[in-house]
């Protein structure tokens, strides 16, 4: 199978390395200098340093060439751009005049200005593209790059897209499950990043494992309420792309969103944290969108509201926690 991976960040690079073990894989990035470095060293020293990439993996800064590769009869196109760049990439794909027949995306979050999920952005920008889906689940790029075990879910309304994605990714240490709840999978992947900031704050303040467990559990309830209101199925949120991804992102030391929370608890400013991080922290980008959607649906999401207060309203982390503890008692 031919596979084109659009986006050479940490996640796109790790997935391309995995795919290249079995398939004719081409990794694209718009940054010619990044591509030149990949071609010379077979390592993404900018985003995934220390991980050797397969010799068979090819690289290109020409989007047209990458799209042609991913548009072959027996091919798959993987969009690994962040949500913030998804619409721009779709524009570029359309302008290139070559939209692959089978597309799967791996980005997580809501578009900041529109509050749209990735599938809604793609439907608006590439309406002719019908065989598509989302690949998501509890996964750190560095561990996938090291070929450590991982389980992911592909969700799509298209059986052909599910089968093609399964054929591409299900090998080696990667196990793929299939489903059709695109909305549920996407909401889980977005909201868990916001909740991971909350658990990072709690851990950074030294509030203990009891508090962490409470935040994860009540956070899962928030995620499920919003997801069901937006059209997802409740059972999706107890699976890999809901609870599984939440546990990993909220507790794993490789989590950028958890790191944001830890650093906020230590008294650092958000601008300083993001500057030092050097990578995307999707929980910061989409927190306000999550809260706005919750309010529009009249859904109570107190943990998300507390995170937004710390990120954007100048509320001290300890005061945000105190506010949660002062909430009226209620039935679970």
From Swiss-Prot:
Its EC number is 1.1.1.94. Keywords: Cytoplasm, Lipid biosynthesis, Lipid metabolism, NAD, NADP, Nucleotide-binding, Oxidoreductase, Phospholipid biosynthesis, Phospholipid metabolism. NADPH binds at residues 11, 30, 108, 141, 256, 280, 282. It catalyses: sn-glycerol 3-phosphate + NAD(+) = dihydroxyacetone phosphate + NADH + H(+); sn-glycerol 3-phosphate + NADP(+) = dihydroxyacetone phosphate + NADPH + H(+). GO terms for biological process: carbohydrate metabolic process; glycerol-3-phosphate biosynthetic process; glycerol-3-phosphate catabolic process; glycerophospholipid metabolic process; phospholipid biosynthetic process. Sn-glycerol 3-phosphate binds at residues 108, 137, 139, 192, 245, 255-257. Pfam families: NAD_Gly3P_dh_C, NAD_Gly3P_dh_N. Pathway: Membrane lipid metabolism; glycerophospholipid metabolism. It comes from the Bacteria. GO terms for cellular component: cytosol. InterPro entries: 6-PGluconate_DH-like_C_sf, 6PGD_dom2, G3P_DH_NAD-dep, G3P_DH_NAD-dep_C, G3P_DH_NAD-dep_N, NAD(P)-bd_dom_sf. It is found in: Cytoplasm. One of its GO terms (molecular function) is glycerol-3-phosphate dehydrogenase [NAD(P)+] activity. The active site is at 192 (proton acceptor). It is an enzyme of class 1 (oxidoreductase). Belongs to the NAD-dependent glycerol-3-phosphate dehydrogenase family. Catalyzes the reduction of the glycolytic intermediate dihydroxyacetone phosphate (DHAP) to sn-glycerol 3-phosphate (G3P), the key precursor for phospholipid synthesis. HAMAP family: NAD_Glyc3P_dehydrog. This is Glycerol-3-phosphate dehydrogenase [NAD(P)+]. It comes from Burkholderia orbicola (strain MC0-3).
């Amino acid at each position: 199978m031919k596979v084109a991976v659009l986006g050479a960040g940490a996640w796109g690079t790790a997935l391309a390395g995995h795919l290249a073990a079995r398939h004719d894989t081409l990794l694209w990035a718009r940054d010619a200098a990044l591509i030149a470095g990949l071609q010379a060293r077979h390592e993404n020293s900018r985003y995934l340093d220390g991980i050797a990439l397969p010799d068979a993996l090819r690289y290109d800064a020409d989007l047209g060439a990458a799209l042609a590769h991913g548009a072959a009869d027996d091919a798959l196109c993987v969009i690994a751009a962040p949500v913030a760049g998804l619409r721009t990439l779709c524009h570029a794909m359309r302008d290139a005049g070559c939209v692959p027949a089978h597309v799967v995306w791996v980005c997580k979050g809501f578009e900041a200005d529109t509050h749209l999920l990735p599938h809604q952005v793609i439907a608006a920008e590439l309406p002719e593209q019908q065989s598509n889906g989302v690949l998501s689940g509890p996964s750190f790029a560095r561990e996938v790059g090291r070929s450590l075990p991982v389980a992911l879910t592909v969700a799509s309304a298209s059986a052909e897209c599910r089968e093609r994605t399964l054929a591409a990714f299900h090998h080696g240490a990667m196990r793929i499950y299939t489903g059709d709840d695109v909305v549920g999978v996407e909401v889980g992947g977005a909201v868990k990043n916001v909740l991971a900031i909350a658990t990072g704050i709690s851990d950074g303040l030294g509030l203990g494992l009891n508090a962490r467990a409470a935040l994860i559990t009540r956070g899962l309830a928030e995620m499920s309420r919003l997801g069901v209101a937006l059209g997802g199925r409740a059972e999706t949120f107890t699976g890999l792309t809901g609870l599984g991804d939440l546990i990993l992102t909220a507790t794993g030391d490789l989590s950028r969103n958890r790191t944001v929370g830890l650093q906020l608890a230590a008294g650092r400013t958000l601008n300083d944290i993001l500057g030092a991080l050097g990578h995307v922290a999707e929980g910061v980008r989409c927190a306000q969108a999550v809260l706005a959607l919750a309010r529009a649906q009249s859904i109570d999401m107190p943990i998300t509201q507390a995170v937004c207060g710390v990120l954007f309203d100048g509320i001290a982390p300890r005061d945000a926690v105190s506010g949660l503890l002062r909430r009226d008692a209620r039935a679970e």
